[in-house]
UniProtKB/Swiss-Prot annotation:
Belongs to the ZHX family. GO terms for molecular function: DNA binding; DNA-binding transcription factor activity; DNA-binding transcription factor activity, RNA polymerase II-specific; protein heterodimerization activity; zinc ion binding. GO terms for biological process: cell differentiation; negative regulation of DNA-templated transcription; negative regulation of transcription by RNA polymerase II; regulation of transcription by RNA polymerase II. Residues 272-564 are annotated as: Required for interaction with NFYA. The gene is ZHX1. Keywords: Differentiation, DNA-binding, Homeobox, Isopeptide bond, Metal-binding, Nucleus, Phosphoprotein, Repeat, Repressor, Transcription, Transcription regulation, Ubl conjugation, Zinc, Zinc-finger. It is found in: Nucleus. It comes from Homo sapiens (Human). The modification Phosphoserine is found at S45, S47, S48, S202, S648, S774. The modification Phosphothreonine is found at T36. This is Zinc fingers and homeoboxes protein 1. InterPro entries: HD (IPR001356), Homeodomain-like_sf (IPR009057), Homez_homeobox_dom (IPR024578), ZHX_Znf_C2H2 (IPR041057), Znf_C2H2_sf (IPR036236), Znf_C2H2_type (IPR013087). Residues 284-346, 464-526, 569-630, 660-722, 777-832 bind DNA.
Length: 873
């Protein structure tokens, strides 16, 4: 780091000895009175810890002279020539400010340290906040002159110039504030003013300005520091002081919500990040701030894209910029403070989400507010167009162009903007704000007090208010046509819709998502098992529809919510018999309507695309309802009423009758038994198993597939009462035994029961399908528990759920039953009561009547044999 020269050679000369080119000053003691120090100059030549703009040590901003030469502390460069040394510093270390000084013009106080100037202000200017720093740069020396502005209540300034300065306003009338816009080149032609313009390309060279408080901003003005009486008559400020006056402002908001009055707080901002007004941040509060990052283009571009980087982005930036993550974090925090960016975590997440959805644009939308006394200036200069960047996310910000030379305050303007713009204005909010359609309005209220700063910035994006801009009829028509083709559009389709409809990518995706959600909920609420293909009825979110928007197939406005609002029976009344014949023939050929078939039908029937789509969709809906009704009737024959009520449609009145579909035969009990047995074996049959079931049962393969789908749905909801009984009946079949032999408990494998007398052999096997549901006799709850106890002798908690489901008993009942068996076993009494055994005997006798065997022998059931063995003992 470079340090100040320890030489006593002065670094300034009198202004009278200077030519217009401002050569190096020779003697500080002979300088103008305004720069006369009140302290020991040598004592105050000690470098300060940090400099106000560069946030680097002032100790590093002047180089040390060693043995008649100059040594650079940034590198190993040494030279005895001061000009060569300064050229080296300017070219190799552009961030370094050489030989900076701070002057309080009010007190003629000079110091080399900013800390000393702060202490001076606390001591001699207590409570004063309206300071203005003016930077004066002369070759190798940078002087910051501090003045005090007298700010009045209405935002104007007390006139400080004397009579001679007031007479010279025509000389400075062409000047404009360089804190807002770069100085015009023509300013350099006025040699008599001894003013030069300094163009800064880096953020740190531009003095920082207050943005959110009623404080004067510092203004960067390059001028001769001499304020002697001989030059006071001709030396004037570059920027002409313009007192506030009633002026109309041109307000062109990118989009204003319909019927919404917005109180808009005006704050100053600028599109160019190098010219954005900044909050003055005391460098002492950020000890680890590295000013070298201010010139890093990578960090500047990243900040301009999004001011809140993630940890992963900070890591990448640290690797690319060769700085530590902590330094980058502090730099981003300081930039947000400078630019007045303060978002909540929710706003950050919302802004990041919208940025990746394509709804947040990196180019800020701007609104121009131009006072007429500036825009109609007679000096021929371009008007001052002060743009404002959207500070909030999202937000509408207006700013007023001040005309004073100091621009110390950004007076908030409370504007009430109300209007009902057209739909195109809301959709095309990306268009730059300065449009010919701007409406001229007077500033209704100018409130420069600090209370106005507390007004919240009004938001422009409708999503921030929970309001969605309604889509037009043309937009909805395009979206519906695309939805009919594919419910999950590809990126190419989304891009095409964005070009046609003018909607953003996020809005299109949200519309498709909402439509799928509403359609799915409507199906589940109505319990309709419809054909879910690309031509299914679209259920549109009502928030997207307007009262004038047409539905698919009719131009009548939608009056009330209906799960299928687009299709009603009266749409088919006006079709001729020839049109219906062509449509039905096409539907029987294929229920999926292709584009080629649609064009052919349009040519033959002279119907519109929407009418044909509506007819096909309604046809498929009516067909599905009929099949569903038949399936319900079949389920009623083989299952309980609860199961039938679960799958019955809630409303069938809305489906028009269609005689083109064939009548499906009702399933017989034998067919239902085969299907249920197959369902117990596997809920997802293979294609070969489907073909086998179709061949054995005589049902159509599509009916079997549909039955399995409905049964799986009922099984998932716990509505299959017969499942466990069929499962227990087929358990022995999976071990190699037939389901009919399972009921012969206690019988050896090769032996069977004799058939009852008087019954012909095999007659029951022929007619057993006619018995329907009585084919299988179910065990009682205690019988299932008894079988489990005889097998395991105790209750395993892992099997408790299965026992509860099979026995249809409660958890506590099952536990109490097993506890009772355990107690009986310990006491040595009969484990099972007589009534339980009698019930099982009756059950077994009924089963014996149903089953036949070729064997003429008979053995008693297992439980009877146990009783006999006990009696023998």
């Amino acid at each position: 780091m470079a340090s100040r020269r320890k030489s006593t050679t002065p670094c300034m000369v009198l202004a009278s000895e200077q030519d217009p080119d401002l050569e190096l000053i020779s003697d500080l003691d002979e300088g103008p009175p305004v720069l006369t120090p009140v302290e020991n100059t040598r004592a105050e030549s000690i470098s300060s810890d940090e400099e106000v703009h560069e946030s680097v040590d002032s100790d590093n901003q002047q180089n040390k002279k060693v043995e008649g030469g100059y040594e650079c502390k940034y590198c190993t460069f040494q030279t005895p020539d001061l000009n060569m040394f300064t050229f080296h510093v300017d070219s190799e270390h552009p961030n370094v400010v050489l030989n900076s000084s701070y002057v309080c013009v009010e007190c003629n106080f000079l110091t080399k340290r900013y800390d000393a100037l702060s202490e001076h202000n606390l001591k001699y200017h207590p409570g004063e906040e309206n300071f203005k720093l003016t930077m004066v740069k002369r070759n190798n020396q940078t002087i910051f002159e501090q003045t005090i502005n007298d700010l009045t209540f209405d935002g104007s300034f007390v006139k400080e110039e004397n009579a001679e300065q007031a007479e010279s306003t025509e000389v400075s009338s062409s000047g404009i504030s360089i804190s807002k816009t770069p100085i015009m080149k023509m300013m350099k032609n006025k040699v008599e003013n001894k003013r030069i313009a300094v163009h800064h390309n880096s953020v740190e060279d531009v003095p920082e300005e207050k943005e959110n408080e009623i404080k004067p901003d510092r203004e960067e003005i390059v001028e001769n520091p001499s304020s002697s009486a001989s030059e006071s008559n001709t030396s004037t400020s570059i920027v002409n002081r313009i007192h506030p006056s009633t002026a109309s402002t041109v307000v062109t908001p990118a989009a204003v919500l319909p019927g919404l009055a917005q109180v808009i707080t005006a704050v100053s901002a600028q599109q160019n990040s190098n010219l954005i007004p900044k909050v003055l941040i005391p460098v002492n509060s950020i000890p680890t701030y590295n000013a070298a990052l201010d010139n890093n283009p990578l960090l500047l571009n990243t900040y301009n894209k999004f001011p809140y980087p993630t940890m992963s982005e900070i890591t990448v930036l640290s690797a690319q910029a060769k700085y530590t993550e902590e330094q980058i974090k502090i730099w981003f925090s300081a930039q947000r403070l400078k630019h007045g960016v303060s978002w909540t975590p929710e706003e950050v997440e919302e802004a990041r989400r919208k940025q990746f959805n394509g709804t947040v644009h990196t180019v800020p939308q701007t609104i121009t507010v131009i006072p007429t006394h500036i825009s109609t200036g007679s000096n021929g200069l371009p008007s001052i167009l002060q743009t404002c960047q959207i500070v909030g996310q999202p937000g509408l910000v207006l700013t007023q162009v001040a005309g004073t030379n100091t621009l110390p305050v950004t007076a908030p303007i409370a504007l009430t903007v109300a209007g009902v713009p057209s739909q195109n204005n809301i959709q095309k909010s990306q268009v730059p704000a300065a449009q010919p359609t701007a409406e001229t309005k007077p500033a209704t209220a100018a409130v420069p007090t600090s209370q106005s700063v507390k007004h919240e910035t009004a938001l422009v994006n409708p999503d921030s208010f929970g309001i969605r801009a309604k889509k037009t009829k043309e937009q909805l028509a395009e979206l519906k046509v695309s939805y009919l083709k594919n419910q999950f559009p590809h990126d190419s389709e989304i891009i095409r819709l964005m070009k046609i409809t003018g909607l953003t990518k996020g809005e299109i995706k949200k519309w498709f998502s909402d439509t799928r959600y509403n359609q799915r909920n409507s199906k589940s609420n109505q319990c309709l098992h419809l054909n879910n293909d690309s031509s299914t009825t679209i259920i549109i979110d009502s928030s997207d529809e307007t009262t004038e928007s047409p539905t698919v197939g009719t131009a009548q406005p939608k009056q009330s919510w209906n799960p299928f609002p687009d299709f009603t029976p009266q749409k088919f009344k006006e079709k001729t018999a020839e049109q219906l014949r062509v449509l039905q023939a096409s539907f029987l050929n294929s229920s999926v309507l292709t584009d080629e078939e649609l064009n052919r039908l349009r040519a033959q029937t002279k119907l519109t695309r929407r009418e044909i789509d509506a007819w096909f969709t309604e046809k498929k809906k009516s067909k599905a309802l009929k099949e569903e009704k038949m399936e319900i009737d079949e389920s009623n024959a083989g299952s309980s009423k609860e199961e039938a009520g679960e799958t019955s449609p809630a409303d069938e009145s809305g489906a028009p009758k269609s005689g083109s579909t064939g009548k499906i035969c009702k399933k017989t009990p034998e067919q239902l038994h085969m299907l249920k047995s197959a369902f117990v074996r596997t809920q997802w049959p293979s294609p070969e198993e489907y073909d086998k079931l179709a061949k054995e049962s005589g049902l159509a393969r599509t009916d079997i597939v549909s039955w399995f789908g409905d049964t799986r749905y009922a099984w998932k909801n716990g509505n299959l009462k017969w499942y466990y009984y069929y499962q227990s009946a087929n358990s022995s079949s999976m071990n190699g035994l037939s389901s009919l032999r399972k009921r012969g408990r206690g019988r050896p494998k090769g032996r069977g029961r004799g058939r009852p007398r008087g019954r012909p052999r095999g007659s029951k096997r022929i007619n057993n399908w006619d018995r329907g549901p009585s084919l299988i006799k179910f065990k009682t709850g205690t019988a299932i528990l008894k079988d489990y106890y005889l097998k395991h002798k105790f209750l395993n908690e892992q099997d408790l759920d299965e026992l509860v489901n099979k026995s249809h008993m409660g958890y506590e009942q099952v536990r109490e039953w097993f506890a009772e068996r355990q107690r009986r076993s310990e006491l040595g009494i009969e484990l099972f009561e007589e009534n339980e055994e009698e019930d099982e005997v009756i059950d077994d006798q009924e089963e014996d009547e149903e089953e036949t065997d070729d064997s003429d022998t008979w053995e008693p059931p297992r439980h009877v044999k146990r009783k006999l063995s006990k009696s023998d003992d």
